[in-house]
Curated annotation (Swiss-Prot):
Keyword Repressor (UniProt): no
Subunit structure: Part of the 50S ribosomal subunit.
Sequence similarity: Belongs to the universal ribosomal protein uL4 family.
Keyword rRNA-binding part of the UniProt annotation: yes
GO molecular function, one term: rRNA binding
Gene: rplD
Record keywords: Ribonucleoprotein, Ribosomal protein, RNA-binding, rRNA-binding
Pfam families in the record: Ribosomal_L4
SUPFAM superfamilies assigned to the protein according to its UniProt record, in alphabetical order: Ribosomal protein L4
Protein's name in the database: Large ribosomal subunit protein uL4
Function: One of the primary rRNA binding proteins, this protein initially binds near the 5'-end of the 23S rRNA. It is important during the early stages of 50S assembly. It makes multiple contacts with different domains of the 23S rRNA in the assembled 50S subunit and ribosome.
GO biological process terms on file: translation
Assigned GO CC terms: ribonucleoprotein complex; ribosome
Disordered: region residues: 67-87
Organism name: Rhodopirellula baltica (strain DSM 10527 / NCIMB 13988 / SH1)
Length: 222
């Protein structure tokens, strides 16, 4: 059981949020978190790298100079890999790095990541985060009041809040995601995670995207 202080937009504590971390995930598997994070990172790779073999670069195959009598080392084509502008000995071709782990494992990893951040005291809870119109300066001031200025922060909202998204996207190191789109990579990358109370309620009652049936049995099998 964890008790998290609930703060308002001015940084003042207005209550306590009680959450049972055992209900989120009964344990934290570093190996599973690593596997899922590496999967997300691999899926983000473009894989557009391309190098040319000596048979693909332009240039003649003619011997550069005669074999003997010049005093130089023996040399053949200009397109060999030891020459400037020549081909590459072991080429890299475009490829698709993406792969997929089981859905259940991915969802369990998301909940494990949330529990890990709670256990490490890296989650901040705000009672309400609402603006009348997109305003970057207001979000920046709220983050400063919460002690999150100049800190990489993930803001987790209950739903798709375009006002908060547009207000926070221009701040370096700040990302805004609805709670249903959270995953192990987005949760573990920033130094702090700012949850609205409503978003944390969805994590608590299991109505966010990372919830699964038979949590304890699934984690035991992971």
């Amino acid at each position: 059981m964890a008790n998290l202080p609930i703060l308002d937009a001015s940084g003042k504590e207005v209550g306590q949020y009680e959450i049972d971390t055992e209900q989120i995930a009964n344990r934290v598997s570093k190996q599973l978190l690593h596997d899922v994070v590496v999967m997300y990172q691999a899926n983000k790779r473009q894989g557009s790298h391309n190098t040319r073999t000596r048979g693909q670069v332009s240039g003649t195959n003619k011997k550069m100079y005669r074999q003997k009598g010049t005093g130089n080392a023996r040399a053949g084509s200009k397109r060999t890999n030891v020459r400037r502008g020549g081909g590459v000995a072991r080429t890299v071709k475009p490829r698709d790095y993406s792969y997929r782990l089981p859905k259940k494992a991915i969802k369990i990893a998301t909940r494990m990541a949330i529990r890990s951040r709670i256990d490490d005291g890296e989650i901040v809870v705000i009672n309400e985060l609402k603006l009348d119109a997109p305003k970057t300066s207001q979000i920046a001031q709220i983050l400063k009041n919460l002690g999150l200025a100049n800190t990489t922060t993930l803001i987790a909202t209950a739903g798709d809040d375009q006002i908060i998204y547009k207000s926070g996207r221009n701040i370096s190191g700040v990302t805004v995601e609805p709670v249903r789109q959270l995953n192990a990579l987005t949760l573990l990358t920033p130094k702090r995670v700012l949850f609205t109370q409503e978003a944390l309620d969805r994590v608590k009652d299991g109505t966010f995207a990372g919830s699964t049936q038979n949590t304890n049995e699934a984690e035991a099998a992971a």
